[in-house]
Amino acid sequence: MNYEEIFTFDNLLEAHYKSRKNKRHKKEVIIFEENLLVNIENLRRRLIKHQYRITSYNRFTIYEPKKRDVAALSYEDRIVQHCFCDNYLTPLLDKKLIYDNAACRKTKGTDFARDRVTSFLYSFYKKHGLNGYILRFDIHHYFDEIDHNILKGKIDKIVKDETLNAFCKMIIDSLIVVVVKVYL
Protein backbone atom coordinates (compact mmCIF):
# COMPACT_ATOMS: atom_id res chain seq x y z
CA MET A 1 0.00 0.00 0.00
CA ASN A 2 1.39 3.41 -0.89
CA TYR A 3 0.95 6.87 0.62
CA GLU A 4 -1.93 7.93 -1.65
CA GLU A 5 -3.81 4.66 -1.02
CA ILE A 6 -3.59 5.19 2.72
CA PHE A 7 -4.82 8.78 2.79
CA THR A 8 -7.96 8.44 0.70
CA PHE A 9 -11.09 10.43 1.44
CA ASP A 10 -12.90 7.30 2.66
CA ASN A 11 -10.04 6.23 4.93
CA LEU A 12 -9.79 9.72 6.45
CA LEU A 13 -13.56 9.83 6.97
CA GLU A 14 -13.46 6.44 8.71
CA ALA A 15 -10.55 7.68 10.85
CA HIS A 16 -12.64 10.72 11.79
CA TYR A 17 -15.45 8.47 13.02
CA LYS A 18 -12.99 6.48 15.13
CA SER A 19 -11.27 9.61 16.44
CA ARG A 20 -14.49 11.23 17.62
CA LYS A 21 -15.49 8.23 19.73
CA ASN A 22 -16.20 9.48 23.27
CA LYS A 23 -15.17 13.01 22.18
CA ARG A 24 -18.22 14.27 20.26
CA HIS A 25 -18.89 16.91 22.91
CA LYS A 26 -15.42 18.49 22.53
CA LYS A 27 -15.28 21.91 20.89
CA GLU A 28 -12.71 21.01 18.23
CA VAL A 29 -14.72 17.94 17.15
CA ILE A 30 -17.92 19.99 16.87
CA ILE A 31 -16.13 22.67 14.82
CA PHE A 32 -14.53 20.04 12.56
CA GLU A 33 -17.90 18.38 11.93
CA GLU A 34 -19.60 21.67 10.98
CA ASN A 35 -17.89 21.36 7.57
CA LEU A 36 -16.97 17.70 7.77
CA LEU A 37 -16.67 16.80 4.09
CA VAL A 38 -14.80 20.00 3.23
CA ASN A 39 -12.43 19.53 6.17
CA ILE A 40 -11.73 15.90 5.24
CA GLU A 41 -11.05 16.86 1.61
CA ASN A 42 -8.77 19.76 2.63
CA LEU A 43 -6.88 17.44 4.95
CA ARG A 44 -6.56 14.83 2.18
CA ARG A 45 -5.22 17.43 -0.27
CA ARG A 46 -2.62 18.69 2.19
CA LEU A 47 -1.51 15.10 2.83
CA ILE A 48 -1.28 14.21 -0.87
CA LYS A 49 0.63 17.43 -1.64
CA HIS A 50 2.92 16.73 1.35
CA GLN A 51 1.90 20.04 2.94
CA TYR A 52 0.54 18.45 6.12
CA ARG A 53 2.46 19.15 9.33
CA ILE A 54 1.65 18.00 12.84
CA THR A 55 0.56 20.91 15.01
CA SER A 56 1.85 21.48 18.52
CA TYR A 57 0.65 19.19 21.26
CA ASN A 58 -1.77 20.28 23.96
CA ARG A 59 0.07 19.60 27.21
CA PHE A 60 -1.70 19.12 30.53
CA THR A 61 -1.49 17.10 33.73
CA ILE A 62 -3.99 14.59 35.05
CA TYR A 63 -4.00 13.40 38.64
CA GLU A 64 -6.24 10.31 38.62
CA PRO A 65 -5.43 7.50 39.17
CA LYS A 66 -1.94 8.99 39.49
CA LYS A 67 -0.18 12.15 38.34
CA ARG A 68 0.71 12.00 34.65
CA ASP A 69 1.82 14.59 32.13
CA VAL A 70 -0.16 14.25 28.91
CA ALA A 71 0.67 15.53 25.43
CA ALA A 72 -2.51 15.37 23.33
CA LEU A 73 -2.72 15.73 19.57
CA SER A 74 -5.09 18.17 17.91
CA TYR A 75 -8.24 16.55 16.55
CA GLU A 76 -7.07 16.78 12.94
CA ASP A 77 -3.75 15.16 13.84
CA ARG A 78 -5.60 12.33 15.61
CA ILE A 79 -7.56 11.69 12.42
CA VAL A 80 -4.35 11.50 10.37
CA GLN A 81 -2.63 9.18 12.84
CA HIS A 82 -5.70 6.92 13.10
CA CYS A 83 -5.79 6.71 9.32
CA PHE A 84 -2.06 5.96 9.05
CA CYS A 85 -2.02 3.39 11.86
CA ASP A 86 -5.27 1.61 10.95
CA ASN A 87 -4.55 1.34 7.24
CA TYR A 88 -0.80 0.82 7.19
CA LEU A 89 1.27 0.68 10.36
CA THR A 90 -0.84 -1.68 12.48
CA PRO A 91 -1.24 -4.36 9.78
CA LEU A 92 2.50 -4.11 9.09
CA LEU A 93 3.65 -4.32 12.71
CA ASP A 94 0.99 -6.74 13.96
CA LYS A 95 2.75 -9.63 12.20
CA LYS A 96 5.98 -8.87 14.05
CA LEU A 97 4.58 -8.76 17.60
CA ILE A 98 4.52 -11.74 19.94
CA TYR A 99 1.18 -13.50 20.31
CA ASP A 100 0.76 -12.48 23.96
CA ASN A 101 1.12 -8.74 23.33
CA ALA A 102 -2.39 -7.40 23.95
CA ALA A 103 -1.61 -3.68 23.88
CA CYS A 104 -3.86 -1.77 21.44
CA ARG A 105 -4.52 -4.79 19.22
CA LYS A 106 -7.85 -5.76 17.71
CA THR A 107 -9.37 -8.86 19.30
CA LYS A 108 -6.74 -8.73 22.05
CA GLY A 109 -8.11 -6.54 24.78
CA THR A 110 -8.24 -6.75 28.54
CA ASP A 111 -10.06 -10.09 28.59
CA PHE A 112 -7.43 -11.67 26.32
CA ALA A 113 -4.59 -10.34 28.51
CA ARG A 114 -6.28 -11.51 31.72
CA ASP A 115 -6.89 -14.98 30.27
CA ARG A 116 -3.25 -15.28 29.16
CA VAL A 117 -1.93 -14.20 32.57
CA THR A 118 -4.29 -16.66 34.26
CA SER A 119 -3.05 -19.42 31.96
CA PHE A 120 0.60 -18.60 32.69
CA LEU A 121 -0.04 -18.47 36.45
CA TYR A 122 -1.86 -21.82 36.39
CA SER A 123 0.95 -23.39 34.37
CA PHE A 124 3.58 -22.00 36.76
CA TYR A 125 1.62 -23.21 39.80
CA LYS A 126 1.41 -26.75 38.36
CA LYS A 127 5.19 -26.85 37.89
CA HIS A 128 6.43 -24.94 40.95
CA GLY A 129 3.60 -24.61 43.46
CA LEU A 130 3.85 -21.42 45.49
CA ASN A 131 7.63 -21.11 44.98
CA GLY A 132 7.80 -17.99 42.83
CA TYR A 133 7.24 -14.28 42.62
CA ILE A 134 5.04 -11.87 40.73
CA LEU A 135 6.56 -8.50 39.96
CA ARG A 136 4.23 -5.63 39.21
CA PHE A 137 5.96 -2.50 37.99
CA ASP A 138 5.67 0.58 35.84
CA ILE A 139 8.53 2.05 33.84
CA HIS A 140 8.49 5.74 34.73
CA HIS A 141 8.24 7.99 31.63
CA TYR A 142 8.82 5.00 29.33
CA PHE A 143 7.70 6.68 26.11
CA ASP A 144 9.40 9.96 26.97
CA GLU A 145 12.77 8.25 27.16
CA ILE A 146 12.66 6.17 23.98
CA ASP A 147 15.69 7.14 21.90
CA HIS A 148 14.29 8.52 18.64
CA ASN A 149 17.38 7.53 16.65
CA ILE A 150 17.12 3.89 17.73
CA LEU A 151 13.38 3.85 17.00
CA LYS A 152 13.91 5.41 13.57
CA GLY A 153 16.60 2.82 12.85
CA LYS A 154 14.04 0.09 13.54
CA ILE A 155 11.51 1.88 11.32
CA ASP A 156 14.10 1.89 8.50
CA LYS A 157 14.19 -1.92 8.65
CA ILE A 158 10.40 -2.30 8.51
CA VAL A 159 9.01 0.61 6.46
CA LYS A 160 10.70 0.36 3.07
CA ASP A 161 8.65 2.96 1.16
CA GLU A 162 10.59 6.26 1.42
CA THR A 163 7.50 8.47 1.67
CA LEU A 164 5.90 6.33 4.37
CA ASN A 165 9.23 6.05 6.18
CA ALA A 166 9.58 9.86 6.22
CA PHE A 167 5.99 10.21 7.42
CA CYS A 168 6.66 7.76 10.27
CA LYS A 169 9.74 9.71 11.30
CA MET A 170 7.80 12.99 11.21
CA ILE A 171 5.36 11.50 13.73
CA ILE A 172 8.19 10.21 15.92
CA ASP A 173 9.96 13.58 15.92
CA SER A 174 6.77 15.58 16.46
CA LEU A 175 6.87 15.00 20.20
CA ILE A 176 9.97 16.48 21.71
CA VAL A 177 10.20 15.68 25.38
CA VAL A 178 12.80 17.24 27.59
CA VAL A 179 13.78 14.82 30.31
CA VAL A 180 15.77 16.29 33.15
CA LYS A 181 17.53 13.79 35.35
CA VAL A 182 18.70 14.85 38.76
CA TYR A 183 21.43 12.77 40.35
CA LEU A 184 21.93 13.22 44.08
Mark where each language-model region is:
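Non-catalytic, polymerase-adjacent accessory regions of viral genome-replication enzymes
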Residues: 1-41
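Short, compositionally biased low-complexity segments
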Residues: 6-22, 54-59, 86-93, 175
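Non-catalytic, well-ordered alpha-helical scaffold segments
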Residues: 10-13, 37, 41, 77-82, ...
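Glycine-/proline-rich flexible loop or hinge segments
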Residues: 18-30, 60-71, 98-100
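Reverse-transcriptase-like RNA-dependent polymerase core
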Residues: 43-66, 79, 86, 166-178
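Conserved polymerase palm-domain catalytic core
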Residues: 46, 120, 124-184
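Conserved pre-motif C helix in the palm subdomain of viral-like polymerases
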Residues: 67-98, 182-184
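Active-site-proximal segment of RNA-dependent polymerases
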Residues: 87-147
